[in-house]
């Protein structure tokens, strides 16, 4: 019983990590953020909305 629970927990953690990695797409260059908003800029791997 305990072993089954441990395996299930490990699989759930693995699935959560994989889903998180798919959702977080790091930008590498300035133009990677143009699809979401014209005023977005790539800063430290994330698309950040810039004022103006």
UniProtKB/Swiss-Prot annotation:
Tissue specificity comment: Expressed in salivary glands. Highly expressed in the head, body and tail with a 2-3-fold higher expression in the head.
Modified residues (Proline amide): 51
Superkingdom in the source lineage: Eukaryota
Signal peptide bounds: 1-21
Primary location class: secreted
Any one GO CC term of the record: extracellular region
SS bond list: 27-42, 33-47
Described purpose of this protein according to its UniProt entry: Leech salivary gland peptide with unknown function.
Misc remark: Does not show effect on voltage-gated calcium channels, potassium channels, and tetrodotoxin-sensitive sodium channels. Does not show activity on Nav1.7/SCN9A, and shows very weak activity on cation channel TRPA1.
The name this protein goes by in its record: Peptide HSTX-X
């Amino acid at each position: 019983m305990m072993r089954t629970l441990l395996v299930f927990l490990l699989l759930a953690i693995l699935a959560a990590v994989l889903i998180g990695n798919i959702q977080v797409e790091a930008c590498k260059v300035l133009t990677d953020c143009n699809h979401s908003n014209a005023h977005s800029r790539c800063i430290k791997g994330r698309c950040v909305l810039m004022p103006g």
